[in-house]
C-alpha cells in the first residue's frame, strides 16, 4: 500500500512538472470548463463506468490520473487522494476530442506496475482513477472497479452527445513509468509551485484545488496504532491504521500559515476569538499517515508546544489549602462560641469572689477593734493555776474563759471571789467593777449612738447638711432647706429645724 501511494505521488509530481513545462492552451481549458459545467448540472452523468476488456491480450490496466492543471490563465485544478478517501470522492472532468499524443497539451496517464514490471490488473483503491478518452470532445474521468460496479449508468447506453461509452477507445497513453523511474520531489517544491501558480491566477474559480498533505514524519509514529487489513482484490494488500482519539489538556495549537494564497473569496475574521493559554480537555487527531502521538511524546518532541498541566495541579493544591484553612476557621469559631458561653459564668464567679472579699474585709475590721484576752495575764501569783503551763497552740478567744483578765477591773481578787462563791453554795465569777472602769450614763441632751441632739457647734450643722443631701427630697427643696439652715442661729431653732426635717423625710 505504501509503495502504491508513493508511486501515485511520484506520477502526480511528474504530471505537474510536465504541465509546468508545456502548459495547456486556453481553448482546451475553456472547453474543459464547459464540459465540467454540463456534468455538474447533470449529477447522473458525473460518474461513468468502464469495464476491463477480457478478450484483449494487451493486459491494459486501469490508468490513474494523478494531476490535471494549467499555468496559463488559471490555478491548477488537481485533487490528490490518499488511502483514507473513498472512491465516491473522485471528481470527473470532461475534455474535448484532440490528438493528445501528437499535441503537447495532452494528458499523461500512468499505469500501476508491480515489482516485475508487468501492469497490474484489477486494482481497486481510493487512489486509482480511470481516464476514458474517445474521439469526441466529452471524455470523462471515472473511478475504479468498485465505482463502475456501483454506477447507475449502463455501459451500452449513449451519453449526452449520443456516443456509447463502450465505443470509446482509451486515451493515447505514454510509456509506463515505474516508481524507480520517477524522481522524488520534496513538499517544499510542491508548495513553491502552488504559490507561483496562485500569484498569476486569473482563471475563474471551479471550486477544486490541489490538496497536498505534508510528508509523514516517521519520527512521530506511535506504537499504539493498530493495522487494519484491507483487501484490494489484487496482488497487493492495503494496510490502513486505526487512529485513536486521545484526550489532552491545553488549548488548540495555532496552525501554521499556508505558503499558498487562498483561491476563493476571503472571509471576515473580525469576530475570531484570540488564542487561549489553557482550555479544557480536547480531542487530538493526527491524519498524517494514520499515526497518533501521545501527549507525553509530543511534549518531549516539540519542546513545550502542548501546554503542561503544572498550572492545573497548582490550582488544585491551592483549592485543597483553602479548604483546609476553611475547616480550621470553623473549628476556631466553634471554640470561640464556647468561650462566649463561659464568659458569663466567669463574670458571675468574679462577682461572688468580690462579695466574699468585702465580707472578709468587714470581718477583719471588726476583729481589729476587739481586744483579745491573753491566757494567764492578770492572774494572781498566789493562784495555784498560775504556774500551770498553757498550751501554746491555744489562741486567746473572747468568751472562752469568763474568769480570765478580770482581775484588773474587779474590786476583789479572783481567789477571794471564788471562796465567797463557794460559801454561798454556788460558784460565780462575777465581781464589781471599779468605778473608773464603769461607763457613765447616757445624757439626754448630748448626741450619742442612741440619737442625735443638735447644738450650736459646726459639727451639728454638718450632720444636718449630710441628712438633707442624702434624703430623697427634690432638688429645689434641698436648696431651700440649705438656705434656711444657714439663716438659723440659736440652738432651739436648730433643734426645731431638725425635728421638721425628720418629719419631711419620714413622709
Curated annotation (Swiss-Prot):
**Xref: InterPro entries:** P/V_Pprotein_paramyxoviral, Paramyxo_P/V_N, RNA_pol_Pprot-P_XD_paramyxovir
Q: Which domain of life is it from?
A: Viruses
Region Interaction with the nucleocapsid (N-RNA), annotated ranges: 459-507
Q: Which range is the signal sequence, renumbered to this chain?
A: none
Molecular function in Gene Ontology:
RNA binding; RNA-directed RNA polymerase activity
Query: Where in this protein does the record put region Interaction with N0?
Result: 1-48
Q: Kindly indicate whether the keyword Phosphoprotein belongs to this entry.
A: yes
Phosphoserine: residues carrying this PTM: 86, 151
Q: Its Gene Ontology biological processes?
A: DNA-templated transcription; viral genome replication
What does its UniProt record remark on the domains? Answer: The N-terminus consists of a long intrinsically disordered tail. The central part contains the coiled-coil multimerization domain (MD). Forms a four-stranded coiled coil structure. The C-terminus constitutes the alpha-helical domain (XD) that binds to the nucleocapsid (N-RNA complex).
- What does it do? Essential cofactor of the RNA polymerase L that plays a central role in the transcription and replication by forming the polymerase complex with RNA polymerase L and recruiting L to the genomic N-RNA template for RNA synthesis. Also plays a central role in the encapsidation of nascent RNA chains by forming the encapsidation complex with the nucleocapsid protein N (N-P complex). Acts as a chaperone for newly synthesized free N protein, so-called N0, allowing encapsidation of nascent RNA chains during replication.
User: Per the similarity annotation, which family is this?
Assistant: Belongs to the morbillivirus P protein family.
The molecule here is called: Phosphoprotein
Species assigned in the record: Measles virus (strain IP-3-Ca)
Amino acid at each position: 500500500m505504501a509503495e502504491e501511494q508513493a508511486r501515485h505521488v511520484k506520477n502526480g509530481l511528474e504530471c505537474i512538472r510536465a504541465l509546468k513545462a508545456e502548459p495547456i492552451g486556453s481553448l482546451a481549458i475553456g472547453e474543459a470548463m464547459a464540459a465540467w459545467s454540463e456534468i455538474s448540472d447533470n449529477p447522473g452523468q458525473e460518474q461513468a463506468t468502464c469495464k476491463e476488456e477480457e478478450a484483449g491480450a494487451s493486459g491494459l490496466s486501469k490508468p490513474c490520473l494523478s494531476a490535471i492543471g494549467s499555468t496559463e490563465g488559471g490555478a491548477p485544478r488537481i485533487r490528490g487522494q490518499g488511502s483514507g478517501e473513498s472512491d465516491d470522492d473522485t471528481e470527473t472532468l470532461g475534455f474535448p476530442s484532440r490528438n493528445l499524443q501528437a499535441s503537447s497539451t495532452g494528458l499523461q496517464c500512468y499505469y500501476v506496475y508491480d515489482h516485475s514490471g508487468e501492469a497490474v490488473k484489477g486494482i481497486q483503491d481510493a487512489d486509482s482513477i480511470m481516464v476514458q478518452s474517445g474521439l469526441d470532445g466529452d471524455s470523462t474521468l471515472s473511478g475504479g472497479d468498485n465505482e463502475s460496479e456501483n454506477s447507475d449508468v449502463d455501459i451500452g447506453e449513449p451519453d449526452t452527445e449520443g456516443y456509447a461509452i463502450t465505443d470509446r477507445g482509451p486515451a493515447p497513453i505514454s510509456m509506463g513509468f515505474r516508481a524507480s523511474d520517477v524522481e522524488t520531489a520534496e513538499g517544499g517544491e510542491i508548495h513553491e509551485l502552488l504559490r507561483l501558480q496562485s500569484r498569476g491566477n486569473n482563471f475563474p474559480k471551479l471550486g477544486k484545488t490541489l490538496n497536498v498533505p505534508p510528508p509523514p514524519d516517521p519520527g512521530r509514529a506511535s506504537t499504539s496504532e493498530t493495522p487494519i487489513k484491507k483487501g484490494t482484490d489484487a496482488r497487493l494488500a492495503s494496510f490502513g491504521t486505526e487512529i485513536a482519539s486521545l484526550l489532552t489538556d491545553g488549548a488548540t495549537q495555532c496552525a501554521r500559515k499556508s505558503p499558498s494564497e487562498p483561491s476563493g473569496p476571503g472571509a471576515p475574521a473580525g469576530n475570531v476569538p484570540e488564542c487561549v493559554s489553557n482550555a479544557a480537555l480536547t480531542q487530538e487527531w493526527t491524519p498524517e499517515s494514520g499515526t497518533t502521538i501521545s501527549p507525553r511524546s509530543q511534549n518531549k518532541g516539540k519542546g513545550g508546544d502542548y501546554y503542561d498541566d503544572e498550572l492545573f495541579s497548582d490550582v488544585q493544591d491551592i483549592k485543597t489549602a483553602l479548604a483546609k484553612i476553611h475547616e480550621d476557621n470553623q473549628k476556631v469559631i466553634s471554640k470561640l462560641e464556647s468561650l462566649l458561653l463561659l464568659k458569663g459564668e466567669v463574670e458571675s464567679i468574679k462577682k461572688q469572689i468580690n462579695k466574699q472579699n468585702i465580707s472578709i474585709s468587714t470581718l477583719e475590721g471588726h476583729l481589729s477593734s476587739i481586744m483579745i484576752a491573753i491566757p494567764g495575764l492578770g492572774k494572781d501569783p498566789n493562784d495555784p493555776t498560775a504556774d500551770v503551763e498553757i498550751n501554746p497552740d491555744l489562741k486567746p478567744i473572747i468568751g472562752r474563759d469568763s474568769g480570765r483578765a478580770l482581775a484588773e477591773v474587779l474590786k476583789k481578787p479572783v481567789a477571794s471571789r471564788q471562796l465567797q462563791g463557794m460559801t454561798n453554795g454556788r460558784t460565780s465569777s462575777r465581781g464589781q467593777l471599779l468605778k473608773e472602769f464603769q461607763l457613765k450614763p447616757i445624757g439626754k441632751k448630748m448626741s450619742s449612738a442612741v440619737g442625735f441632739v443638735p447644738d450650736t457647734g459646726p459639727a451639728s450643722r454638718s450632720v444636718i447638711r449630710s441628712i438633707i443631701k442624702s434624703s430623697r427630697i427634690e432638688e429645689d427643696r434641698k436648696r431651700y432647706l440649705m438656705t434656711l439652715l444657714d439663716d438659723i442661729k440659736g440652738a432651739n431653732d436648730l433643734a426645731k429645724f431638725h425635728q421638721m426635717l425628720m418629719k419631711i423625710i419620714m413622709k
